[in-house]
Amino acid sequence: MDRPVAELDLTNASLYINRELSQLEFCHRVLAMARDPNLPLLERVRYLSITSGILDEFFEIRVAGVKQHATFGAIQRNADELSADELLKNIFAHTEILVAGLYATLNDDLIPALSKEKIRLLRSSDWSDEQRDWLKRYFSSQVAPIITPV
């Protein structure tokens, strides 16, 4: 059965998915796992952490590259026909929603649920003077030497 294959217009932008926007959609799906009350609480915390890590790396690598293209006035559009400036606007719009969802999930869902399980996250404003002093000493003796360039 030889049927003719429809010719595809490979210049049609609707055939392509932007790599950066696709990665943000993936972040939304991971965040949805953090919001799923049917999952164990610590798994939800883990998914939230994964979402945050993906976003950090996304901005360090992908957004930095798009910003470079925008800064140098790259006029070449991707196959999806977005310019670097248009892509940045899309990225920031998606990210604003994503970060708001991330913080809402943390503050409104996970922290209260953790608290019910007697797992408390202390904010720096809740630290005692003794805790603050210990942390300063620990940072100076253990962390700073590792992260300080030679």
Question: What is each PLM-predicted segment?
Answer:
Residues 1-150:
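N-terminal localization/anchoring segments of enzymes in phospholipid and broader phosphate metabolism
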